[in-house]
Amino acid sequence: MIQKNWQELIKPNKVDFITNGSRTHATVVAEPLERGFGLTLGNALRRVLLSSLRGAAVTAIQIDGVLHEFSSIPGVREDVTDIVLNVKEIAIRMEGEGPKRMVVRKEGPGVVTAGDIQTVGDVEILNPDHVICTLDEGAEIRMEFTVNTGKGYVPADRNRAEDAPIGLIPVDSLYSPVRKVSYKIENTREGQVLDYDKLTLNIETNGSVSGEDAVAYAARILQDQLAIFVNFEEPQKEAPQEQVAELAFNPALLKKVDELELSVRSANCLKNDNIVYIGDLIQKTEAEMLRTPNFGRKSLNEIKEVLASMGLHLGMEIPSWPPENIEDLAKRYEDQY
């Protein structure tokens, strides 16, 4: 059936988010993935994380007494070009839409930092210790910043309005809240298969969004972009009512243990103990299994791991097991496990 193209692909059964209490750094680990899907998803998520998440940034700066960015200010150690470069690194969170204006006014001697900026409304400075410029004794500076929201990187010439007043200096705007993204692909194991992919993403943000949320937003963007390519509805498979009513246990119990891809040693031990179906196996306790000839702790752990992946475990009680027509039921339900 055509739906097996996507229904039978392995999907991650866990995604771990590791932050160690940091708002700006996160490690995301997803496994297992089909071979090759780690690279596919890692590259796609990285590109979207860096280019498509919205954020806030300074778009222009106006300094009292300065007409253009190639000026210098008496008593200020940095020239205007350096000040503009420092302003670009201010990390901002703004919930609403822009543009909005912020002001900083300070007298020397001392250092002007992002924390000296007088914010308005829902604008928050995330790196208040970031240095903008240094003032000597008797120096004074007043700057006004224009802040807006957007996505990606916008160069200064696109922030230059035609009707901008003299002295308004446009700034390159890095709106993306994600600063760095790297990923690596490693092999991981699922059951007896050793070459599935494990995807590890390392994310650094400016603090306006957590790494976990950033990945969620990027995945949602990809989901929306890909949805247009799906030109069919999901096939609905309905089990006959009489079959549902007839079966009093999980159909997976009708699967034979020789289909579990166990090691040869474990499979032979089960065969020698006349354990044919998963339903036979799960009713055995760990102690009973360890009394089986040639069956050791390694085989026990292997079987427990395989059963756990199916939501089962040893020592379960199935009152209606085994059914009288077990072979017929196994054939009837073989496409449901």
Swiss-Prot record:
Comment field on protein domains: The N-terminal domain is essential for RNAP assembly and basal transcription, whereas the C-terminal domain is involved in interaction with transcriptional regulators and with upstream promoter elements.
Subunit-level organization: Homodimer. The RNAP catalytic core consists of 2 alpha, 1 beta, 1 beta' and 1 omega subunit. When a sigma factor is associated with the core the holoenzyme is formed, which can initiate transcription.
Enzyme Commission no: 2.7.7.6
Matches recorded under HAMAP family: RNApol_bact_RpoA
Family: Belongs to the RNA polymerase alpha chain family.
Catalytic reaction(s) noted: RNA(n) + a ribonucleoside 5'-triphosphate = RNA(n+1) + diphosphate
Function comment: DNA-dependent RNA polymerase catalyzes the transcription of DNA into RNA using the four ribonucleoside triphosphates as substrates.
BP terms from Gene Ontology: DNA-templated transcription
CDD domains on file: RNAP_alpha_NTD
GO cellular component: cytoplasm; DNA-directed RNA polymerase complex
Span list, region Alpha C-terminal domain (alpha-CTD): 249-337
Gene3D superfamilies associated with the record: 5' to 3' exonuclease, C-terminal subdomain, DNA-directed RNA polymerase, insert domain, RNA polymerase, RBP11-like subunit
Keyword line: DNA-directed RNA polymerase, Nucleotidyltransferase, Transcription, Transferase
Enzyme class name: transferase
SUPFAM superfamilies linked to this entry: C-terminal domain of RNA polymerase alpha subunit, Insert subdomain of RNA polymerase alpha subunit, RBP11-like subunits of RNA polymerase
Region (Alpha N-terminal domain (alpha-NTD)): 1-233
UniProt protein name: DNA-directed RNA polymerase subunit alpha
InterPro entries: DNA-dir_RNA_pol_insert, DNA-dir_RNA_pol_RpoA/D/Rpb3, DNA-dir_RpoA, RBP11-like, RNAP_asu_C, RNApol_insert_sf
The gene coding this protein: rpoA
Transmembrane segments: none
Single Gene Ontology MF annotation: DNA-directed RNA polymerase activity
